[in-house]
């Protein structure tokens, strides 16, 4: 049985060296809300020896034009590069686990000879705040 989950996606990239961390974070949130599959940054050396950031956006082809507009509107870049890339993913599913603190979602990921389980951060953070515990204490107690 084949476990391969690979698809071709578009990757949009741009360089920025004159945005604050807050501005870049806001841009990333806005890009995700506009339909990006993934948004991440890579630290890079820019021209004139400036530290900068490469903003990377993975998307479906039909979202590309919209996302380019969102990138230009929310960053200081003057150019966006486009690449085709292969994206390999594990199969994902969720299950609800009953705990002494209420229901918690658990993400199950598998494929390529790997199986993983991970509790959802938002649920753990909620319990930690409600119970006055650290995230590590919550993980250990459930």
Indicate where each model-derived feature is located.
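Intrinsic-disorder/low-complexity, polar/charged segments enriched in Ser/Thr/Lys/Arg/Asp/Glu/Gln
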Residues: 9-11, 54
